[in-house]
Amino acid sequence: MEGLPLAKANVEAVVRIQTWLEASIRAHQTVGVETVLSTDKYRRLVTEAKQRQFAVRLFFVMLNSPDLNVQRVRLRVEKGGHDVPEESIRKRWNRSLAQLPWFLDQSDQAAIYDNSGAVPRLVGRKQNGATVVDPDAPLAFREALGLLAGPDRK
């Protein structure tokens, strides 16, 4: 995609990876996808993989707040990495958590990590159909899974 304007190159890259993923699943080849999970575009892919008897494994790495996401992107930019507008970071953080329950439900195994501290911490997992969540997992994660109710939502 050399020589293309950045926006056009990004679109071309998305089309190519989607085509490759679909072909890989049809050929029953193992695939892995990294995404911020801020859209539902991979739902169809997961559904097709499940229909073709793939085991679906989810590794979800989160931060405990959109503010921390903004800070991490600023640090990345300071080190020469790419920038993302703050508004986009905040929207994606919320949409990612909104998408999580569906993908967790579809997964055969899952591990959810809170990467807010110096060391990532396992805060949830799914195995053999059972999902276990650390009671000290970030509030937003527990809310996304509908684990909080009543006036004492801590």
Q: How would you label these PLM feature ranges?
A:
Residues 1-29:
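Conserved substrate/cofactor phosphate-moiety recognition/catalytic segment
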Residues 7-12, 34-35, 88-90:
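Short, flexible loop segments at the rims of nucleotide/cofactor-binding pockets, characterized by
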Residues 13, 17, 41-42, 96:
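Amphipathic coiled-coil/heptad-repeat helices and related helical stalk/stem segments
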Residues 22-26, 48-53:
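Conserved catalytic network of the ASCE P-loop NTPase/AAA+ motor domain
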Residues 28, 52-57, 106-109:
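Short glycine-/polar-rich loops that comprise or flank the Walker A/P-loop
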Residues 33-43, 63:
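Acidic, metal-coordinating catalytic cores used for nucleic-acid/nucleotide bond scission
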Residues 52-100:
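A glycine- and Lys/Arg-enriched "phosphate-lid" helix/loop adjacent to the NTP-binding pocket
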Residues 102-154:
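NTP-dependent small-molecule kinase module
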